[in-house]
Swiss-Prot record:
This is Probable pectate lyase 18. Belongs to the polysaccharide lyase 1 family. Keywords: Calcium, Glycoprotein, Lyase, Metal-binding, Signal. The keyword Aminoacyl-tRNA synthetase does not apply. Its cofactor is Ca(2+).
Length: 408
């Protein structure tokens, strides 16, 4: 056990010497960061030794933080301390009580019934929302979330599908974990409640799986997405401090839009981490499509695309590290990247770089800008693992089949 602990310690430290772990912005005193990291590693290793965790770790820092605990259902809110990247400070409903959803039907957008998911998410208090049993929830209108909420699907098979889906609008500290989100439709031209004290008229929604509109400190982890009317996950209108991790995405065209428009300057402060996701079967483009802002795309598995994987316009900074890109068997779709809506004379100054990516089946990444530009400091949020480890790091992406009383 001592040798195993020593190896784990050395492995983690070696990564951290070359890349800042869990930081969303550069820091003036790197030595203080190293000291803090040492404390975190020591605490983590000690805790895992005590609980016998070392034998089940995978190298995925999010999963290794909680999945080895056979009593995870008794410690649900510890998940909030496992986030990484730019959304690492999203605590969701960690400091609130547990709310159990018991009713999968009876969705009333204005007067939600207690026990329904809508009743839970509009409350003012922090809540950690779980589900009594397996259920499929078909919403009549978009589910407008209030701040400091966690939707935690572990222990049940929870599907939100067949209607409008989740909206995170001008709120903060949201965690969405362990649910299936698919076949989302447009809603709107209707009254919808957003808090216990307010409901209002909603225009037509886009039909996204998760729409983040002016939201901050958002973490979407271990969800399965497919086949929505617009995007699977879109973040626009000044949204920032977001981590999208361990998700499995399939059967969709425009997967992920990050940034409202080329002219919307508030998105210049957007920071998003995209880590340990599997972009799978039936996807076409936008994994993601970025505007303005800073985007860290790290240790994802790209096994399918038809047009391109990563694209953008309006001078976004894209830091691609340790990903695996398997190009399709389409002659003119081998390029990972797409610089959009600008001539080469302009986009060649945008800061896009590939570092340690594995490019297969003829895949190629077209870099631009300065490889050592200082802007990458704002697009670095965790230490990348080698691309050779992407398979095991992403092998359990998507909603997990967690059962109480056993490791998840």
């Amino acid at each position: 056990m001592k040798m195993q602990t020593k190896k784990l310690f050395i492995t983690i430290v070696s990564f951290l010497l070359y890349a800042p772990l869990f930081l969303s912005s550069p820091v003036p005193d790197p030595e203080s960061v190293v000291e803090e990291v040492h404390k975190s590693i020591n605490a983590s290793v000690a805790g895992r030794r005590k609980l016998g965790y070392l034998s089940c770790t995978t190298g995925n820092p999010i999963d290794d933080c909680w999945r080895c605990d056979p009593h995870w259902e008794q410690h649900r809110q510890r998940l909030a301390d496992c986030a990484i990247g730019f959304g690492k400070n999203a605590i969701g409903g960690r400091d609130g009580r547990i709310y159990v959803v018991t009713d999968s039907g009876n969705d009333n957008p204005v007067s939600p019934k207690p026990g329904t998911l809508r009743h839970a998410v509009v409350q003012d208090e922090p809540l950690w929302i779980i589900f009594q049993r397996d259920m499929t929830i078909q919403l009549k209108e978009e589910l407008i979330m209030n701040s400091f909420k966690t939707i935690d699907g572990r222990g049940a098979s929870v599907h939100i599908s067949g209607g409008p889906c989740i909206t995170i609008q001008y709120v903060t500290n949201i965690i969405i974990h362990g649910i299936h989100i698919h076949d989302c439709k447009q809603g709107g031209n209707a009254m919808v409640r957003s808090s216990p004290r307010h409901f209002g008229w909603r225009t037509i929604s886009d039909g996204d799986g998760v729409s983040i509109f002016g939201g901050s400190h958002v973490w979407v982890d271990h969800c399965s997405f497919s086949n929505c009317e617009d995007g699977l996950i879109d973040a626009i209108m000044g949204s920032t401090a977001i981590t999208l991790s361990n998700n499995h995405m399939t059967h969709h065209d425009k997967v992920m839009l990050l940034g409202h428009s080329d002219t919307y300057s508030r998105d210049k402060n957007m920071q998003v981490t995209i880590a340990f996701n599997h972009f799978g079967e039936g996807l076409v483009q936008r994994m993601p499509r970025c505007r303005h802002g800073y985007f860290h795309v790290v240790n994802n598995d790209y096994t399918h695309w038809e047009m391109y994987a990563i694209g953008g316009s309006a001078n976004p900074t894209i830091n691609s590290q340790g990903n695996r890109f398997l190009a399709p068997n389409i002659r003119f779709s081998k390029e990972v990247t797409k610089h959009e809506d600008a001539p080469e004379s302009e986009w060649k100054r945008w800061n896009w770089r590939s570092s340690g990516d594995l490019l297969l089946n003829g895949a190629f990444f077209t870099p631009s800008g300065g490889a050592a530009s200082s802007s990458y400091a704002k697009a670095s949020s965790l230490g990348a693992k080698p691309s050779s480890l992407v398979g095991p790091l992403t092998s359990t992406s998507g909603a997990l089949n967690c059962r109480k009383g056993s490791r998840c």
